[in-house]
Amino acid sequence: ADTANIDEIKELFNYFPIDGVTTNPTILSHENKTLSSVVAKIQKCIEGKMLHIQTISEEAEDILHEAKRYRDYFELNDNYYVKIPVTKNGYKAIKMVKDAGMNVTATAIFTQQQALIAAGADFVAPYVNRLDNISSHGIEVVSDIVKTFKLYDIKCKVLAASFKNVDQIYRVSMVGCHAVTASYEILEAIMKHPMTDKGVLDFKKDSSNIYDV
C-alpha cells in the first residue's frame, strides 16, 4: 500500500493480501505530522509486515547513516526496507546499506538500465505513470526489467509504483511484475465493477421469494 494514512492502511488490510507499506517524503507530507509520529503509528498498524522508508540525504555516507538512524530509532528489523533513489550517490549507497545488513528498495527508476545497475537491491521500483506522462511507456519498461532479471537469474524483485488507473496495474501484472504498491484510491477501485453490482442486485431480486431458511 502506497500510503501513510493510518485509516486507509487499516481498511486496506481488511481486504487485500498486503505485504507491507511504502512511503516517501511526498506521501508522508500529506499527513501533516512528523516522520517519527507517522512511522510509529504505521508500525503498530502493520504488525511486522514490510515498511519502506525513503532516505532524503544526498551523499552515500549520509544515506547510510540516515538508514541506520531510522533502524535504531524505530527498532526495525528484517521488515525494514531502505528506499534509496537511484542517483549516482544512491547507487553507491545501495551497496553500502546492503553491506550493513539492511534491505534496500531502489526507487525513482525510469529505465531498464537503471534497474539493472541497482539490481543488488532487494526491490527496484519503476514509476509507471510518471513514465507515461512523459510520453514513455511505463509498462514496457517494467516488462523489460522483469525479462532482464529473469534472463540473468537476478534475485532482485520488481515493485512497480506510480499508478493512475487500474488498467496499469492489470498490465504490469500480465508482464510478470512481482509486486505493486498503489494508493488507497486505486486499490479501492480494483475491487469494484458495475457488472458485479448489477449481478448482486439481480440475485437479491430473484431470491426474494425462494430463500425461506
Question: In which residue ranges do the predicted regions lie?
Answer:
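Active-site beta->alpha loop and helix N-cap motifs at the rims of alpha/beta catalytic domains
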Residues: 2-10, 15-18, 23-100, 128
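Catalytic cores of alpha/beta
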Residues: 7-15, 65-66, 93, 113-120, ...
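Conserved, mostly hydrophobic/aromatic
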Residues: 24, 82, 116-118, 172, ...
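Glycine-rich phosphate-binding active-site loops on the catalytic face of alpha/beta enzymes
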Residues: 25-28, 108, 122-135, 175-196
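Active-site-adjacent beta->alpha loops and helix N-cap segments on the catalytic face
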Residues: 30-41, 59-65, 84-99, 110-119, ...
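Alpha-helix-loop-beta-strand connector modules within alpha/beta enzyme cores
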Residues: 36, 40-52, 72-75, 91-102, ...
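Short catalytic-loop micro-motif centered on adjacent basic/acidic residues
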Residues: 81-83, 104-106, 157-160
